[in-house]
A protein has these predicted regions:
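Extracytoplasmic, non-cytosolic globular domains
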Residues: 1-118
């Protein structure tokens, strides 16, 4: 977010930050924790209420497995831990037949965040 950097002006005090993550695998490579990620985002943005976290990721398997789907193996995914630290978040399933319900929920979370957002 440096003035001369390629992302100059990306973080603005007059705008929400909407972070969207899409994955079909668990993060096993990161050396830090969801708490570290949360702290970094809040430090950069200044207010957790000015952030909307969205994630489409594997869910716990219910019933017969769907072909070509990845499932949460029963442990709490690190991205799930991260998004739930923020007051505004939505989570979708990588194996969903449609992503429309997820994005409708996501749009609702953004609207909720906008309604309570006071630009800095």
């Amino acid at each position: 977010n440096a003035e001369e950097g390629c992302n100059a002006g990306f973080l603005r005090p007059d705008a929400l930050l909407v972070v969207t993550m899409i994955t079909d695998t668990e993060d096993v490579e990161s050396k830090t924790s969801p708490t570290n990620w949360y702290d970094a985002v809040v430090t950069a943005k200044g207010d957790p209420g000015a952030v909307v976290m969205l994630a489409i990721q594997p869910q716990t398997q219910v019933g017969e497995p769907k072909p070509n789907c990845t499932y949460d193996e029963g442990y709490d995914l690190r991205l799930r831990q991260l998004i739930k630290m923020f007051p505004f978040y939505a989570e979708g399933d990588t194996c969903a037949a449609s992503y429309v319900p997820f994005f409708e929920t996501a749009a609702g979370r953004v609207a909720e965040a906008c309604a309570s957002f006071i630009p800095g």
